[in-house]
Structures are given as C-alpha cells and as structure tokens.
A protein has these predicted regions:
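Secondary-structure capping and boundary motifs in well-ordered enzyme cores
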Residues: 11-15, 35, 43, 73-76, ...
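Membrane-embedded alpha-helical signal segments
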Residues: 90-93, 185-191, 198, 205-206
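Divalent-cation
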Residues: 146-151, 155-157, 187, 193, ...
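Single conserved hydrophobic/aromatic residue that forms the stacking wall/gate
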Residues: 209-221
Length: 221
C-alpha cells in the first residue's frame, strides 16, 4: 500500500494554522479597534499555552530512548520541533507587525504609547518619580552567581534579564527582575485631549539603567 503519511497534517502545525487565523482577525480593519487588540492578546496567550503544554511535551519525548512517532504523519518529536520553530518565528514576526499597525491606529484615536527613548525633560522627570515611588519599592531583583542559583521562573510571568557589572572585579553577572502580576501592567496619563500609556516592563528597563548599587551597576537590559 502506498505511503499516505504526506496527505495528513501534523497536529501541532495544524494548531499553529488555527492560531494564525486568530491573529489575522487583529488585522481586519472592519472590526472595532479594541476587538482587534483583543485578538492579538488571544493569539499570544494561545501561543504561551502551546509552548507550555505541547512543545514542552515534545521536548520531554526527545529525552526518551525510543521516541514515539506521530501516529498520523510519522514525524519524530525532534522533527516536529524543527518544523514548529520557523513557523512560530514567522507568526511572531507577523504579530509584531500587526502590533505596530494597531499602535498607529491607537495614535490616530488619541491613545499614544510612551516612547521612553524620546522623552523630554518634563516627561523623564515624571516617569522617574513614578518609578521611584510606585514600582521600585515592590521590585525583587535577584542576582545569579555562585551563591545564588538560577531562580525558578513561573509560567506566564514577565521577567527582565539584565547584565550587571561588578565594580570590584570587573566581571559580569546576570540579574533577574520579576515583574510581579500584582503590579499594574499599564500606566495611563491624561494630557490635554490625549491619553498616554506606558508598559511597566519598559518603564523598569529605562529606570534600571540609571540605578547603581555600591558594588555593581546595570550595563545591559
């Protein structure tokens, strides 16, 4: 009997095609803007779940001596991972492009995302003060070194990685900064007839560069 494995779609790749259709809803200009943003969020949440459950399971299977083949397509776990990786990169690039389109659409409607690379003096002062009073007290940064092993990172949480320069030894160490789910993810500022909004992780990144401890300072974040 002729081999018909090529006639069938792999379950993981088929799921990615489904999630691509969710993503394409974010680019449909016929939909309300907030609904398009919601589809973008759903796409990303779906992808998180996909990696936690499906891709994680495939990686576990690669550790077994006798890898089970996919019943339908007869692909090994390693072959499935190799097929998934470029497909996800393609979808993520498309998601990033749609995100920029939606930011432009938001700007047309007087909702402007704060660009921390181009702040005037007044804006810089405001956000630094906000970080110092509202965010810094609840940050719990961790250093990874010989005395402190790499910490457990929880699923669906945001972490920032920073490179720290040790002043006494000139060596570099890794720092992990958890962005607690207890923090507000976004911060809004009303100005005239516009509303500016900032992401917490971007504000933390900006502020960490200007923080220097007695023994170390942030050089890359």
């Amino acid at each position: 009997m002729e081999n018909t494995y090529h006639c069938y779609a792999n379950r993981e790749l088929s799921w990615l095609r489904f999630n691509e259709r969710v993503l394409e809803e974010a680019e449909d200009s016929r939909l309300p803007l907030c609904e398009r943003l919601s589809f973008l969020s759903i796409f990303q949440s779906n992808l998180d779940e996909f990696f936690m459950v499906r891709v994680g399971s495939l990686y576990d299977q690669t550790l077994l001596k006798n890898n089970k083949l996919d019943i339908v397509t007869h692909m090994t776990p390693s072959e499935q991972i190799a097929a998934i990786t470029p497909r996800v990169a393609e979808l993520q690039a498309k998601c990033d492009k749609y995100y920029q389109h939606l930011l432009s659409a938001l700007k047309e409607n007087k909702y402007i995302k704060v660009d921390f690379d181009h702040l005037d003096k007044q804006q810089e002062h405001y956000w630094k003060a906000y970080f110092t009073s509202e965010i810094l007290p609840i940050l719990s940064p961790q250093v990874v070194d010989q005395r402190h092993p790499f910490p457990f990172l929880r699923n669906k949480e945001i972490y920032l990685g920073v490179l720290l320069h040790e002043k006494h030894t000139s060596e570099h160490t890794l720092g992990i900064v958890p962005i607690s789910s207890q923090m507000e993810r976004m911060h809004f500022v009303r100005k005239d007839n516009e509303t500016c909004f900032a992401l917490t992780e971007e504000l933390v990144l900006l502020s960490l560069i200007h923080i220097s401890e007695p023994t170390r300072r942030v050089v890359i974040s």
